[in-house]
Curated annotation (Swiss-Prot):
The record marks H124, Q340 as: Interaction with tRNA. This is tRNA-specific 2-thiouridylase MnmA. Catalyzes the 2-thiolation of uridine at the wobble position (U34) of tRNA, leading to the formation of s(2)U34. Its EC number is 2.8.1.13. It catalyses: S-sulfanyl-L-cysteinyl-[protein] + uridine(34) in tRNA + AH2 + ATP = 2-thiouridine(34) in tRNA + L-cysteinyl-[protein] + A + AMP + diphosphate + H(+). It comes from Xylella fastidiosa (strain M12). Residues 145-147, 307-308 are annotated as: Interaction with tRNA. It is found in: Cytoplasm. The active site is at C99, C195. One of its GO terms (molecular function) is tRNA-uridine 2-sulfurtransferase activity.
Length: 379
């Protein structure tokens, strides 16, 4: 068998199946590789073995070689430990961004080269174009499925060695193609959420690694409302899981998380989704990553997303001396959350992004002041 020039990341889902089929139909020399990034705990929550069987079946139908690699150790060291540390520090991380940077476009790419390939392909909904002497990361044609948000940490070296064969397709088109070509994954449900959590209750999963520290739930006026099982388990804007029943002299309206103070172990809530405590017009990020290798300018305007699938928000970006960003939004933003990703766009092009460090929301300023006083519970 000839040495493959392209290794396709086979997840066992319909997206990677069609990606492999399209390349194969173009007579590219390809092979498939299934990555195991998490060691199953025996509860079958990740469906990893089922996904592996589906990947094997698709490779068999296409007549291409199948490879398997276990990256669970790398995932634990480079993604999961960071995930836990962020929650322990009161932030809400985005492990998919790290997984792409550290696993799929680092270890997987290295493995593909060891197998003799010079490029990799994945089933991401994004596009890559080369013009003006550099590679550009663009949104996928299907905006409802676009995954450039999770790919903003990629750089020129990775883009030069990567193909996104389904980036020009709508999801409905893709499923039709899969059905017409007889791929066994054509009707398979899309995976959602974080694989290592699967279908389990998020709080129960996190308790295995971060011990519960119950404390008070208070309103903005410091009035005690109820008790919480641990501030780690909640994020800004969260409504579900608070277990706040009827509160005396309060209307029967839903409660929303508006902040958390690790120093006092207090979770703050309010009954208004548009609470001023959830509003911000400014944020500061950690040092940014730029797809091109450098920012467009010291100060520039663009659009931003502070969460996946958020509508584009106009903003002004100032690059600080340490590489971090000050971002001023044209409109007030809701529940901008430290630890999440700020991703910047110029039209359909993803410029890059950074982890959100802090905002000008009232309780977030308090959290930032107290964070340095709090010991890391993982130590």
């Amino acid at each position: 068998m000839n040495t493959p020039r392209i290794i396709v990341a086979m997840s066992g889902g319909v997206d990677s199946s069609v990606a492999a089929w399209r390349l194969n139909s173009q007579r590219e020399a390809i092979a498939g590789l299934f990555m195991r990034n998490w060691t199953d705990d025996g509860n079958g929550q990740c469906h990893a073995e089922e996904d592996r069987r589906d990947a094997v079946a698709v490779c068999g139908i296409l007549g291409i070689a199948f490879h398997f690699r276990d990256f669970s150790h790398e995932y634990w060291q480079e993604v999961f430990t960071h995930f836990l540390a962020e929650y322990a520090n009161g932030r809400t991380p985005n492990p998919d961004v790290l997984c792409n940077r550290e696993i799929k476009f680092k270890h997987f790419l290295e493995t593909a080269r060891e197998l003799g390939a010079d490029r990799i392909a994945t089933g991401h909904y994004a596009r890559i174009e080369h013009y003006r002497q550099r590679w550009h990361l663009l949104r996928g044609a299907d905006r409802s499925k676009d995954q450039s948000y999770f790919l903003h940490q990629l750089g020129q070296e990775q883009l030069a060695a990567t193909l996104f064969p389904i980036g020009d397709l709508e999801k409905q088109q893709l499923r039709q193609l899969a059905h017409q070509t007889g791929l066994p994954t054509h009707a398979k449900k899309d995976s959602t959420g974080i694989c290592f959590i699967g279908e389990r209750n998020f709080r129960e999963f996190l308790k295995q690694y971060l011990p519960a520290q119950p404390g008070e739930i208070r309103d903005p006026q410091e009035q005690r409302i109820a008790e919480h099982p641990g501030v780690f388990y909640f994020t800004l804007g969260q409504r579900q899981g608070l277990n706040i029943g009827g509160v005396r002299n309060r209307p029967p309206s839903p409660w929303y998380v508006i902040g958390k103070d690790l120093a006092t172990n207090v979770l703050y809530v309010d009954q208004h989704r548009d609470s001023p405590f959830l509003q911000s017009r400014w944020l500061r990020s950690e040092p940014a990553h730029w797809v091109s290798g450098s920012p467009p300018a010291h100060t520039f305007t663009c659009t931003a997303q502070t969460r996946y699938r958020q509508a584009d928000e106009p903003c002004k970006v100032t690059v600080r001396n340490d590489g971090s960003l000050d971002v001023d939004f044209t409109r007030t933003q809701w529940a901008v959350t430290p630890g999440q990703s700020l991703v910047l766009y110029d039209g359909n092009e993803c410029l890059g992004g950074a982890v959100i460090a802090t905002t000008d929301a009232p309780l977030e300023r308090k959290r930032a002041r107290n964070l340095s006083k709090t010991e890391n519970v993982l130590q």
